[in-house]
Amino acid sequence: FSTGRKENLDHVKGKIKLVKCDLSNKGEWIEEFKNVDWVFHLASLADIVPSIQNPEGYFSSNVDATFYVLEASRHANIKRFIYSASSSCYGIPDEYPTPEGSDIRPQYPYALAKRMGEELVEHWAQLYNLPAISLRFFNVYGTRSRTSGTYGAVFGVFLAQKLANKPYTVVGDGNQTRDFTYVTDIVSALIAAAESEKTNKIYNVGSDTTVSVNKIVELLGGNKVNIPKR
């Protein structure tokens, strides 16, 4: 788990099989693809800042691993392959709200690695006829959110600060906006993509609503401390 915890799955114990493995070592997991219909490739390292500090690790986990999973899916004749892409591939847009047709300009190793994953999926769909779709997630939040990181994790960070009776730490003036997407909507999108007959497509998955960080603070209630942008 790169951002989650094993304990998050306690409520489904006995209903799932958990395999601990390294995706770069296919021998550890390749057998698990037998008799599987759908593959949801959600495994990756997350967050932008750590990717700047560790680009090699991010490319190994987010690009190389995607290649291995695609190859395993192809050889196992998987019926549907769904890739978790990222809205970060758009980079810093020139206009807000940002049109879907905006240029793809990844500006950090994490964003670039996720975009390269999209391109791998497109290539496998075109060349090998692997039925595959990529979904670009926008700032996912919800139950059992992590309490560290940036962007989508801001809810978890703020909730942890609220429970500790600490002020919310707001980077900059707090007027920056994000499209936050609730986790159950993400799950619905994943299932819809798997049930669809579409292939070699990329879709944005968001709430179509922008919310400022200051608005989140207002909704949660409490004091805030503004800190400079990095």
Regions found by a protein language model. Name each.
Residues 1-38:
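N-terminal Rossmann/SDR dinucleotide-binding element
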Residues 21-24, 163-230:
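C-terminal substrate-binding subdomain of Rossmann-fold SDR/epimerase-dehydratase oxidoreductases
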Residues 50-51, 101-103, 132, 136-147, ...:
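A conserved pocket-lining segment of Rossmann-fold NAD(P)-dependent short-chain dehydrogenase/reductase
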Residues 28, 67-72, 120, 180, ...:
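Conserved mid-core alpha-helix of short-chain dehydrogenase/reductase
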Residues 39-45, 81-87, 135-137:
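SDR active-site strand-loop-helix element
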Residues 4, 24, 53, 61-64, ...:
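Residue-level signal for the nucleotide or nucleotide-sugar donor/cofactor binding architecture
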Residues 53-68, 75, 79-80, 89-134, ...:
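Catalytic helix-loop patch of NAD(P)-dependent Rossmann-fold dehydrogenases
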Residues 23-60:
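NAD(P)H-binding glycine-rich loop region in Rossmannoid oxidoreductase-like domains
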